Amino acid sequence: MSAVTSDYTPQRVVCLQPSATVILAALGRLDRVVACTKYCADVCPEVKSGGRSIIADSWTAQSRQILAARPDLVIAAVPYQEKAVVEILKAGVRFLGLAPKTLADIYCDIATIAGAVGASQRGQTVIANMQQEIEKVRKRVKGRRRLRVYCEEWGKPLIASQRWVAELVEAAGGEFLGDPGAQSSAESILAMDPEVVVAAWCGAGDRVPLEKIVRDRKWQPMSAIREGRVYCISDELLNTPAPTLVRGLQALAAAIHPGSFPQPERLRCISDTRVRTDAHRSD
């Protein structure tokens, strides 16, 4: 859904979608953002400065709160509150809705936002850089055995990561298990016997309780658990469809091929906790 015209360059943007904020930062157009949600600020801390309005979240925000920022463009994920969209459009404000499912969709979103804010050339550069970084990783893992990888974006219920994450897992040299974005059960995941488990829960950062989920789900017989290959990746690196996915890919590559890629800061392995616990007990 879009009401953006090609002959207009917005100067006051309200971001209700974190990925849009990250994309605008990559485009060098963060100065156009006059208001955003707290989740946008979480993934893009730079937006907290400059006196910008912080809206609680996109689903509880009222149109009057959004319009109070005097935007000429509102960017949100769709489907969105139908009533709010109608009121925004009635006020003469342009609305851009994002609903990416694949990496190709994300590239299109970057190009669309770049075009809307007068940064088309920069947008193409951002896209090209993403594609080049993904291809670098793909080439490094070419010919290696693909490990079975289970990635989830939520734990109760168990929901597999989105399709773009499945594409990143493949690029990192893994075999994505299950259906992207689908709900599953602990028993069905155990039956697939993943060799690597990655948890990136929405809104949890890198604080997923890995030991607890293994214990509660009775996954001890799983290959990934026996080998200590259970990881948490900060959710913004995988769940935010923006240029930062490249860092998520690097974390996935380190989880799948730890001997070939350095472990980034926002990748945590269940064995890391065990090492700290053992060291504490020996003191």
Regions picked out by a protein language model, each given a short descriptive name:
Residues 1-283:
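N-terminal ligand-binding lobe of clamshell/alpha-beta domains
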